[in-house]
């Protein structure tokens, strides 16, 4: 049975992905891995909202998703960003299909808190059949984080949560959070494998700080019964060299050495 990797690419790193990154994806495809991509698009959404002069408000650091904001987000996520990624994969000889969580009932959600956050969903159910159909044909699904309710309302969902849900539904062997750093660093050296307990200690000690904390917390929350290994890797360089993944691996517990 083929192994599966899900990549989560944040909106801030998508346009900075290196040629080495795409070459590595190609190598993995050629060596028999199934691949799916979930992407964000925050910076591009903000830019488009400004261009269209759509007013926004923030609640607890999160942009409230009003109907006009949602329409803009869907336009950017399913349109500009999604097709940009598909095109970059095509340039590297890889077949990809751009979809969103609405397609084929992939991500089914309910309102997180409509009064507070607006059109934002919490994923309740996944149906990965559309992903399996694409993978069977050797096509990489590139997924925008949008979902649908049981009443067919469109909701925006957190891209990290979407990636975690997709990885869980696929029983993925690896979920890779693609960032602009080599992994979790302690000074100049990269920490290769960490458990949740070790990560908390590093946060308490200030080794993990600033913008790295939300990246690490996203990776931690993705660990589940169905996703046993999460990695933080660098999209600005090679993440797969000498037949090994380069980055920080986050596991529930380390294997005991007997």
UniProtKB/Swiss-Prot annotation:
GO process annotations (BP): arginine biosynthetic process via ornithine; L-arginine biosynthetic process
Pathway: Amino-acid biosynthesis; L-arginine biosynthesis; N(2)-acetyl-L-ornithine from L-glutamate: step 2/4
Reaction(s) this enzyme catalyzes, per UniProt: N-acetyl-L-glutamate + ATP = N-acetyl-L-glutamyl 5-phosphate + ADP
Transmembrane parts of this sequence: none
Highest taxon in the source lineage: Bacteria
Gene Ontology cellular-component annotations: cytoplasm
Subcellular location: Cytoplasm
Enzyme Commission number(s) from the entry: 2.7.2.8
Broad enzyme group: transferase
Main location: cytoplasm
Main function: Catalyzes the ATP-dependent phosphorylation of N-acetyl-L-glutamate.
UniProt name for this protein: Acetylglutamate kinase
Organism the protein comes from: Bacillus velezensis (strain DSM 23117 / BGSC 10A6 / LMG 26770 / FZB42) (Bacillus amyloliquefaciens subsp. plantarum)
């Amino acid at each position: 049975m083929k192994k599966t990797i899900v990549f989560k690419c944040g909106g801030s790193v998508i346009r900075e992905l290196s040629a080495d990154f795409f070459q590595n994806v190609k190598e993995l495809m050629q060596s028999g891995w199934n691949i799916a991509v979930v992407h964000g698009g925050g910076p591009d959404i903000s830019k488009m909202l400004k261009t269209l002069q759509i007013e926004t408000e923030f609640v607890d650091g999160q942009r409230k998703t009003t109907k006009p904001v949602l329409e803009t987000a869907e336009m950017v996520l399913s349109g500009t960003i999604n097709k940009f990624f598909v095109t970059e994969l095509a340039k590297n000889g890889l077949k990809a299909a751009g979809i969103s969580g609405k397609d084929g009932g992939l991500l089914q959600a309910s309102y997180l808190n409509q009064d507070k956050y607006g059109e934002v969903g919490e994923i309740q159910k996944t149906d990965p059949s559309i992903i399996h159909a694409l993978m069977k044909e050797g096509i990489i699904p590139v997924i925008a984080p949008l979902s649908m309710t049981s009443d067919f309302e469109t909701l925006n969902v957190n891209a990290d949560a979407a990636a975690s849900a997709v990885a869980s539904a696929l029983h993925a062997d690896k979920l890779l959070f693609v960032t602009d750093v080599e992994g979790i660093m302690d000074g100049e050296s990269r920490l290769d494998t960490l458990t949740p307990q070790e990560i908390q200690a590093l946060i308490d000690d200030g080794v993990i700080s600033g913008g790295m904390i939300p990246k690490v917390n996203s990776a931690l929350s993705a660990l589940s019964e169905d996703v046993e290994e999460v990695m933080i890797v660098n999209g600005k360089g090679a993440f797969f060299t000498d037949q090994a993944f380069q980055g920080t691996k986050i596991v529930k517990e380390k294997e005991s050495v007997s």
